[in-house]
C-alpha cells in the first residue's frame, strides 16, 4: 500500500481492487474479444477493473509468489487482460488497445531467498512491455515472511514511496 498511499498524498486519484474478494472467472479462451467486440465478453466483478485500467495512468499489481508464480487471483486477472490485445497483435507494432503512456509497477514478495523465482519478475515485466507500459518497474522483496518486521520491509516501502513521488508528484 506504500505506493498507493504516497500517490494519494500527492493528490493522485487511487483506485484499489482486492482480487481475492472479487467474484470473477478466468479467461475462457472464447476469442470474443478478438471477433465480436474490443473488450472481454464476460461480465463479472473484474469488468470494472478492466475498464478502469483504460483510464489509469499507472497500473500497480502486487502479489506474493506462491509455488513459483504470482497468486492464482492475479494470474487469472492477467489472463483476462488478453482482451486488451488486438486480434492480430503478433504482427503489429502496436499490439495493445490500451492508450499509450501508462506506467506499470509490479510488487512481489516471497519467503524464498533472492536466488529463487528469478523468472517471475522477468515474465511479468515482459507482460507489461507487451501491453505498452514502457515505463515500468518491479519491486521484489525476497525473504519477506508474514513475520517480517517493519524494519525488514522498510527498504521496499521506501522504494515504492520514491517511485510514487517520481511518477505521481505534481
Give the ranges of each region predicted by the language model:
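Residue-level recognition of beta-strand->loop/alpha-helix junctions
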Residues: 18, 139-140
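Short, glycine/serine-rich, charged loops/turns that create anion-binding
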Residues: 21, 111-112, 143
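Short hydrophobic/aromatic-rich motifs at helix boundaries and adjacent loops
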Residues: 21-22, 46, 50, 95-98, ...
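N-terminal beta1-alpha1-beta2 submodule of the flavodoxin-like/Rossmannoid cofactor-binding fold
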Residues: 1-86, 146-170
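Hydrophobic anchor at the start of a short beta-strand
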Residues: 14, 135-136
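Short, glycine-/small-residue-rich phosphate/pyrophosphate-handling segment
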Residues: 89-134
Amino acid at each position: 500500500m506504500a505506493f498507493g498511499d504516497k500517490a494519494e498524498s500527492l493528490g493522485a486519484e487511487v483506485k484499489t481492487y482486492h482480487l481475492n474478494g472479487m467474484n470473477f472467472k478466468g479467461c475462457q479462451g472464447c476469442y470474443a474479444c478478438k471477433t465480436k467486440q474490443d473488450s472481454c465478453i464476460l461480465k463479472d466483478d473484474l469488468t470494472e477493473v478492466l475498464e478502469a485500467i483504460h483510464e489509469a495512468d499507472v497500473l500497480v499489481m502486487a502479489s506474493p509468489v506462491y509455488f513459483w508464480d504470482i497468486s492464482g487471483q492475479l494470474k487469472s486477472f492477467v489472463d483476462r487482460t488478453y482482451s486488451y490485445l488486438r486480434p492480430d497483435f503478433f504482427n503489429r507494432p502496436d499490439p495493445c488497445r490500451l492508450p499509450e503512456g501508462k506506467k506499470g509497477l509490479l510488487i512481489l514478495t516471497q519467503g524464498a531467498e533472492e536466488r529463487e523465482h528469478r523468472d517471475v519478475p522477468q515474465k511479468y515485466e515482459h507482460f507489461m512491455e507487451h501491453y505498452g507500459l514502457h515505463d515500468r518497474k518491479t519491486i521484489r522483496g525476497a525473504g519477506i515472511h508474514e513475520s517480517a518486521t517493519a524494519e525488514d520491509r522498510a527498504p521496499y516501502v521506501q522504494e515504492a514511496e520514491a517511485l510514487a513521488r517520481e511518477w505521481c508528484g505534481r
